[in-house]
Amino acid sequence: MVAAVTVGLLLTACGSGPLPSNLAAKEGHQVEHASSASPSASESLPQTPLRAGEHFVELKTPADYRPTPKAGSTDDYRCFLLDPGLTEPELVSGVNIIPGNPNIVHHVIVSQVPASQVARAQALDAADAGDGWTCFGGTGIGGVGGRNLDKSDWVGAWAPGGGERVMSEDVGIPLEAGTQVVVQMHFNTLTGGGADTSLVRLRLSPAAGSAKKALNTMLLPAPVELPCRLGHTESPLCDRAAAIDDVKTRFGETVATADLLHVLCGGDPIGDTQQCTRSVREPMVIRAAAGHMHLLGRSITIDVDKGTPQAKRILDVPVYDFDDQGSRALS
């Protein structure tokens, strides 16, 4: 049995009424996953010029971090705490994440850490040898998605096919003074090796006096526990409990994510197709949607009000391409 997670995400702004203008996307297929190209973090894609009141803050992960998967694994999930030096509240209006070594970078998630939780993050860093700390499934600071799944602590994310995301001028992600960020890197050394230094470029503007609506990321995880293939059912990891224990051994997971997903989503824990239905508890406008799976993924959809006259499919990926995971702006 292979235990994994499928994640859909929505960029949402609270409020009702007509759908505002989309996030302005500046996305391109930056580098194919596991390709032979290895651009440095300084080799950015062309960026959208700064708009009135905006400025850039650039953050880099520790220089030349070399992933060190545990024996029997090719995955290293590592979190790094970085300080953007915010002395006043700011709004994030764009994110550009540039992997330094895309041969080994599977995905990147940037999460905010409010000032009240920075000491917790620093303690996790200090308790783990070397740069950063092991963080499978989340940062380890505030649970999966930080605050909660409906309004997560995500600031931005990158997976193969993603690029710079510049938001519509009427929205922004709030960051309070003293906020720091955690950059979670998922490294996979199956088809490559070497070191990595990645870059996160935040597009910021002052929050004071701004009329922008707060933008949040809603996480839509679903369980993916694939049955072992015919002819391979004798593996010890075809036992669900053994597979989950293996994940905890390799990545130090302290939260039973797999079991929590089944409480959230219900259904048979093992199957080729999985789904999860979530309730929306307040008015919101969906600005963009994205789906993330691993290489065994075949298709992914996100439906709103399924089975009702108002039903609408907001994400439809009939043939999933691991190298094309950029978010889709909605109209």
State where each predicted segment sits.
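C-terminal motif of bacterial Sec signal peptides marking the signal peptidase cleavage site
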Residues: 10-13
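Sec-dependent N-terminal signal peptides
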Residues: 1-7
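Beta-strand-centric surfaces of beta-sandwich/beta-rich domains
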Residues: 27-331
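Bacterial signal peptide processing site
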Residues: 15-18
